[in-house]
């Protein structure tokens, strides 16, 4: 049986009640050569049972993995990647959604450019009909530009499709809230070419209480862990770029924590 072009990995934890819109837009994708891998992270509600029911009635090619223990989104994504059969990996958070032509446009850009990674802009949706388009950084074409891009590149796995082989011998770190920040520069480093679609194709739902917006005194520590992971994963020739990125991460983590404390 022919392997799909894309494997879409979706970590889930007590999230079934937020998933209807994302599943709807998966079923409406104009490019259909893909599989969906749900990774249930030991949900304590009926999410796993609902996923099994959905698998039986859905038109999508679906596989479901259940973690042995609660491991967080990074490890859940790693399990999904290990099970993936697609040439490229895409990620979707359980409460977010794609534009209907997300995969079609990503595939077209891959074919056109031969890139290892394609990424796009995204919408930040606030759940009340309001949304904001977030633009991304330009891509690199030369080595010196690649260095700058590692320092400045986007932080989201979900707005990207990534050649599956780039994940060989590297795993997403088990860092709550900052695993994307740690992982994207490494994937860019390992890539031969990155391409960019200047169009918002992903919807990120801003939901108070979700993992990425929850109040936590561990935020700054998460970014410190992300920086340490980066510093140990990329050669010294990129030391300046990683230090620059690390300073950004640490400052963001500190300011984020201060703002959250002020809101309590």
Model-predicted regions and their roles:
Residues 14-28:
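Short, well-formed alpha-helical segments that are part of the catalytic scaffolds
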Residues 25, 40-49, 69:
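A conserved acidic beta->alpha catalytic loop
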Residues 144-218, 222-223:
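Conserved nucleotide-sugar donor-binding catalytic segment
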Residues 67-84:
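Glycine-rich, basic loop-to-helix element that forms the pyrophosphate-binding segment
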Residues 1, 205-264:
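C-terminal subregions of glycosyltransferases and related glycan-biosynthesis enzymes
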């Amino acid at each position: 049986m022919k392997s799909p072009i894309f494997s879409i990995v979706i970590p889930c934890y007590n999230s079934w009640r937020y998933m209807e819109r994302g599943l709807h837009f998966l079923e409406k994708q104009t490019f259909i050569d893909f599989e969906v891998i749900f990774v249930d992270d030991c949900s304590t509600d009926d999410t796993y049972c609902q996923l099994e029911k959905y698998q039986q009635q859905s038109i999508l090619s679906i596989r479901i993995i259940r973690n042995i223990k609660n491991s967080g989104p990074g490890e859940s994504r790693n399990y999904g990647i290990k099970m993936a059969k697609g040439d490229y990996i895409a990620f979707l958070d359980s409460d977010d959604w794609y534009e209907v032509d997300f995969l079609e446009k990503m595939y077209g850009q891959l074919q056109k450019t031969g890139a290892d990674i394609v990424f796009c802009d995204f919408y930040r949706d606030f759940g009340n009909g309001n949304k904001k388009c977030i633009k991304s950084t330009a891509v690199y074409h030369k080595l010196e530009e690649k260095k700058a891009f590692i320092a400045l590149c986007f932080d989201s796995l979900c707005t990207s499709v990534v050649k599956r082989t780039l994940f060989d011998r590297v795993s997403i770190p088990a860092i709550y809230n900052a695993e994307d920040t740690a992982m994207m520069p490494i994937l860019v480093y390992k890539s031969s070419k990155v391409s960019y679609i200047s169009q918002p194709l992903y919807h990120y739902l801003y939901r108070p209480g979700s993992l990425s917006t929850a109040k936590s005194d561990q935020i700054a520590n998460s970014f410190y862990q992300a920086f340490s992971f980066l510093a140990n994963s990329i050669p010294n020739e990129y030391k300046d770029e990683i230090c620059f990125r690390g300073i950004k991460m640490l400052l963001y983590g500190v300011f984020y924590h201060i703002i959250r404390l002020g809101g309590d």
